[in-house]
Design a protein with these regions (language model features):
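Catalytic alpha/beta active-site cores
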Residues: 1-115, 137-140, 146-150, 178, ...
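A glycine-rich phosphate-binding loop feature that marks nucleotide/adenosyl-phosphate handling sites
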Residues: 23-27, 62-69, 104-113, 144-156, ...
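Mobile "lid/hinge" segments at catalytic clefts and subdomain interfaces of large enzymes
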Residues: 47, 52-91, 168-246, 252
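Short glycine/threonine-rich loop-to-helix capping motif typified by GTGT followed
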Residues: 72-78, 113-125, 154-167, 195-205, ...
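Glycine-rich anion/phosphate-binding loop at the beta-strand->alpha-helix junction
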Residues: 85, 109-197, 201-205
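Intrinsic disorder at enzyme termini
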Residues: 183, 219, 244-346
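C-terminal accessory/binding modules appended to enzymatic or scaffolding proteins
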Residues: 333-374
Length: 424
């Protein structure tokens, strides 16, 4: 930070007008890496003092995007972020920093999920609740109550297969954050799940938000969602849930104590598990992964890039529990990669017969279901008899034959199909 100030001075910049942040976040590192960094108050105050010549620079960061990337629910992310920010505010004030100065040095970094309207409501609720919290410290200037929020598209819902769908995810996420009035946005490159983003994917990521700014003019409006009953109602609902969580954390000793005890990590990891279960049952849809996969896509040399701990994947003792950053698609991707690299891709043949509407519906479901595991699927228009369907399956070299028909007709076709296959 000191070098930064010296550099700006040498360049002759007007220090009072420069905006940016240093993003010191010890509690975030505690949850991500498992290191005990609880004695951070002195360092935080020193940062504030060093950056005194830069009044518009933020140096303390509430990096709540880590919770989002770990699969937290929206109310959890916001509730813990408020407690997180309040902990930093308390520590700075206890270290002798005035409330106004302390609040003006804190920045929030939120994640953006694919829940479009809920994300708009989250940011609106966050600004309101943070203003209420800071106001309780009686700052000299009301401007200290303003939340500075950066938004970053989530990595939890990004996928390795059909990776270009990630562009659609991040675009709608960016749109929701822009409509919510965040101060700045980072769009995650679509290929981050399987490699270090290159010049192309980074340029596309930049252009995604430039489209919203320069062509849609989203930077020219202030709170366009105001007055919408649906979003206002969501804002109140999320604010209530987040506030209840904030109060619960404060009653138990504050965010630092909750992190040291592993309570925050335990709650977020439980949400991660619940969301993985929802994805496995298709209650939460990931297009191209657990629903409507690209039948012909192969991963090739792609391998998922997963977050590693401070020990670079080696086992180690951690004094503090850590967050689980496994993406929602990770289990499906593991299954599909194992299938693809097993040496033989199972071939599933759809024996469509009988009622036209039902056989098409059953074939579509079966193709999607099996392709999610990386199986090669062969769909068909229909067969007049079971025997013809079985012969076609044998000629195609099928490993699996799926009878696709109506419930009433299954009893009629199942026995002849079993006899025609006869262990073949």
């Amino acid at each position: 930070a000191k070098l930064l100030v010296e550099y700006f001075q040498k360049q002759g910049y007007d220090l009072t007008q420069l905006q940016g942040s240093v993003n010191y976040d010890p509690m975030g590192k505690m949850m991500a890496k498992g290191k005990d960094l609880s004695n951070f108050a002195a360092t935080a105050k020193e940062l504030v003092d060093v950056l005194a010549p830069l009044p518009k620079y933020r140096c303390i960061c509430v990096n709540a995007v880590e919770l989002n990337n770990a699969g937290s629910y929206i109310s959890q992310e916001l509730g813990y972020a408020l407690a997180w920010g309040n902990e930093y505010l308390n520590k700075l004030i206890e270290a002798g920093v005035p409330a106004t100065s302390a609040a003006k040095r804190i920045k929030f970094n939120f994640g953006i999920s694919s829940n479009y309207f809920l994300e708009i409501a989250k940011f609106r609720a966050g600004r309101m609740l943070w203003a209420n919290i800071v106001n309780e410290y009686k700052p000299e200037c009301e401007c200290a109550c303003k939340m500075i929020a950066h938004a970053e598209t989530s990595t939890f819902n990004l996928t390795l297969f059909d990776a270009h769908v990630n562009l659609l995810r991040t675009q709608t996420e960016t749109m929701s954050a822009a409509l919510a009035g965040v101060n700045s946005i980072t769009v995650t490159p679509f290929d981050k799940t399987y490699k270090t983003p290159d010049d192309f994917s980074e340029r596309i990521a930049r252009n995604q938000q430039l489209l919203l700014k320069e062509e849609c003019h989203f930077n020219k409006v202030v709170d366009p969602a105001a007055g919408s009953y649906f979003i206002e109602n969501l804002t109140v609902s999320i604010a209530k849930q987040a506030w209840d969580l904030f109060l619960n954390v404060e009653e138990e000793g504050g965010m630092l104590e909750a992190v040291k005890a592993g309570k925050v990590q335990e709650a977020v990891n439980a949400s991660n598990k619940a969301r993985h279960d929802a994805v496995s049952k298709r209650k939460e849809v990931l297009l191209g992964t657990n629903q409507f996969p690209n039948f012909n896509e192969k991963a090739g040399e792609k391998n998922p890039v997963e977050a590693q701990c401070c020990c670079s994947g080696n086992s180690c003792e951690k004094p503090i529990a850590t967050l689980n950053f496994n993406r929602a698609a990770s289990e499906f991707e593991t299954l599909r990669l194992q299938t693809e690299r097993s040496g033989k891709r199972p071939k599933a043949f759809m024996l469509t017969i009988g009622n036209l509407a039902m056989r098409q519906a059953r074939a579509q479901f079966s193709c999607n279901f099996l392709a999610c595991a990386g199986y090669e699927v062969i769909d068909n228009l229909g067969f007049p008899t079971v025997e013809e369907g079985v012969e076609a399956a044998m000629k195609a070299g099928a490993d699996i034959v799926v009878i696709c028909s109506s419930d009433d007709e299954y009893a009629e076709y199942a026995v002849p199909a079993f006899k025609a296959l006869n262990g073949r």
